[in-house]
Amino acid sequence: MKNFPKAMIAGLVATIVLSLFFVMKDAMGIMPQLDLPRMIAGMMGMPDAPRLGWAVHFFIGVVLYGAALALLDEHLPGNSKIGHGVLLATAGWLMMMVVLMPIAGTGLFGLNLGISAPIMTLMLHLIFGAVLGAYYGHALARQASVPLRA
C-alpha cells in the first residue's frame, strides 16, 4: 500500500507526457481523425465535450494505471520497472484495441481509421509505459536511498 502514492504520481507524469504527444500530434495535423479525448467523450454520449474525455484520460492514466502498477509490480516477471510499465501499457493498448475501439465505432484495432491508428496508439502506449515504469522505479530507488529517522 505504501507504494500507491508513488505509482499514482508515476501515472500522472506518464499521462502528462502522453498528453503532450497528443497535443503535438494535433498541432502537426497527424491523424486528426484519431482524437482520443473526443472518442472517450463520445463513448460517454457527449462527443462535443472533449474536456470530459481529457478528464477520463487522466483518470485512467493516474488512477487505473497507477493502481495496477502498485498492485501488480511485484508479481510481474523480471525486475525492470520500465519493463513492468511497458507490459501494463501494452495490456491496456490491447484492451483498447479489442474493446474500446469497436465501441467507439472505429472497428477492431481502430482499423476504420486506417492502419496507422493501431501503430500510433501502440507507440504512444509504449512511451507511456516506459515513462510510467521509469518514474516509478526512480521513486522507489529514492525511497530506498533515504535513511530512516529514529
Give short role names for the model-derived ranges.
Residues 1-150:
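Juxtamembrane/disordered regions of integral membrane proteins
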